Design a protein with these regions (language model features):
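Segments of small-molecule ligand-sensing domains
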Residues: 141-157, 164-244, 263-266
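Extracellular/periplasmic Venus flytrap/periplasmic-binding protein
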Residues: 1-84, 123-127, 131
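Rossmann-fold dehydrogenase core element
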Residues: 108-120
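Venus flytrap/periplasmic-binding-protein-like
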Residues: 86-111, 183-192
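Ligand-binding clamshell of periplasmic/extracellular solute-binding protein-like
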Residues: 66-75, 94-103, 124, 160-161
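A short, charged
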Residues: 245-266
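C-terminal substrate-binding/catalytic core of Rossmann-like NAD(P)-dependent dehydrogenases/reductases
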Residues: 125-143
Length: 266
């Protein structure tokens, strides 16, 4: 793509993500006039004007959309793309907040071919994921959850699974639930994830080393993995692309003991 549309819901995550993307794209030689940035309120459902603007913007050069639209609001956006005759081959969309749960029970035809970036997809074929899905299906059946057999697993579920297991391991190691003690014990903890990767909490910044997986939306509401990193990527707490944060340090070991510092505390 030569032009980029950064479209998101108006809150801190999309604005921070797009701030990083702006700096990144400009570092790759993308001109300011070739970046369109737009925000919508939570629950927004009328994308007619926005899609028309995107269509006009894309007329000059090949264009891609990075969507940080929150959850369910993605559906009317994709539908409007279809209404205006725009397919994934015309203007591909990569979303950071669309997963199996958002697609469950809706017509995915207008969404087929578009992309999503996560750390996990239900379609990942690993023994760990097979066991994870089996346990989830048994839980759904036992508790008679709405949707029954159509219930899905998704990235936030895997993230929760990893987080709880890591916390439990840290509590066992610390021998207490005291926050400070657990914080010291949790750095360096590892968990074998449903995605098949061994996930590690960084010993210093306490962010997770995780893989990046890009999936293409299918008609059945699942994703076909089209690209993934070879392994987990070391987490960076602060973006090197934003000048005001590039010198910040997140380090929970002595003498820093801080998540937002430019000099050590001790």
């Amino acid at each position: 793509a030569k032009r980029w549309v950064l479209l998101g819901t108006d809150y801190v995550y999309p604005r921070t993500t797009n701030k990083i993307l702006n700096y990144f794209l400009k570092s790759k030689g993308v001109a300011k006039k070739d970046i369109m940035e737009t925000y919508t309120p939570f629950g927004h459902s009328d994308y007619q004007t926005i899609v028309a603007d995107i269509k006009k913007f894309a007329a000059g050069k090949p264009t891609a959309v990075v969507s940080t639209i929150n959850g369910d609001s993605n559906v009317p956006f994709y539908k409007e793309l279809g209404n205006q005759g725009l397919k994934a081959e015309d203007i591909p969309v990569v979303a950071f907040s669309v997963g199996e749960e958002e697609l469950r029970g809706i017509d995915t035809k207008p969404l087929v071919g578009h992309l999503a970036a996560w750390n996990y997809f239900m379609s990942v074929k690993t023994p760990e994921n097979k066991a994870f899905i089996k346990k989830w299906n048994a839980y759904v059946k036992k508790n008679k959850l709405p949707g029954g057999s159509k219930r899905v697993t998704n990235d936030p579920m895997e993230a929760t699974y990893i987080g709880i297991k890591m916390w439990a391991q840290a509590v066992e190691q610390a021998g207490t639930t005291n926050i400070d003690a657990v914080r010291q014990a949790i750095g360096g903890q590892t968990v074998q994830s449903p995605s098949g990767f061994e996930i590690t909490m960084d010993a210093k910044n306490h962010h997770l080393h995780k893989p990046v997986v890009i999936g293409e939306i299918q008609e059945d509401g699942q994703f076909e993995v089209v690209w993934k990193t070879d392994g987990p990527i070391r987490a960076q707490a602060w973006s090197p692309f934003i000048p005001e944060s590039s010198k910040k340090v997140a380090d929970w070991t002595y003498p820093w003991v801080c998540g937002n510092c430019t000099k050590a505390k001790f």
